[in-house]
Amino acid sequence: MSDPHNLTPFIRSVDDYPIPGIKFRDITSLLETPSAFATACGEMTALSAGFSPTAVIGIESRGFIFAGAIASRLSQPLVLARKPDKLPNASFSKAFDLEYGSTALEIQKNTQLSDQDRVIVVDDLIATGGTAVACAELLSEHFGVARQNILVLALIDLPNLGGSDAIRQGGFNVASLMAYT
């Protein structure tokens, strides 16, 4: 367990949720404690600032929580990566597998991103890396963002599930505040 910011007391572990064999990391206590949430957002913003981003991408749904705060603090645009059929305009889509199923992410085609951008992809947790890699590939393939100009940032990393390694192997950068091993 790596937790240099002392946020562990605000993360609950729930066994066998959403299916047997999965240990869910529940961040609601962190969100309900203003000082802990402020610390998390501040530290994630500090990690982001050194990357010099031009946009922040929030992954549905818990990634939205942190991405909005980070984008606001960095004065950068916030782009939403949503589940299928949640966006009103034509969208690019990328299917991927989760540790307990499969789905897709979508970003609107009219989003103002280009090959000149440096983006941060924000989510609450990295498990197998499927969600983050799908989002990063969507940005690279459809908006021309160079892989080395994409940073995947999460509150929590579960390195034993291989997600961070998968992100790095895809040519993307990765960082997190906490790691549960």
Predicted features along the sequence, with ranges:
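Generic enzyme active-site microenvironment
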Residues: 58, 121-122
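Short Gly/Thr/Asp-enriched flexible loops that form oxyanion-binding sites at enzyme active sites
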Residues: 65-74, 136
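Short, glycine/charge-rich flexible loops or terminal/linker lids adjacent to PRPP-binding catalytic cores
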Residues: 76-120
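Acidic, divalent-metal-coordinating active-site segment for phosphoryl/phosphodiester hydrolysis
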Residues: 123-133
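Short glycine-rich phosphate-binding loop at a beta-alpha junction
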Residues: 52-60, 150
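Active-site-facing substrate-recognition patch
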Residues: 1-53, 108-110
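PRPP-dependent phosphoribosyltransferase catalytic core
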Residues: 9, 134-181
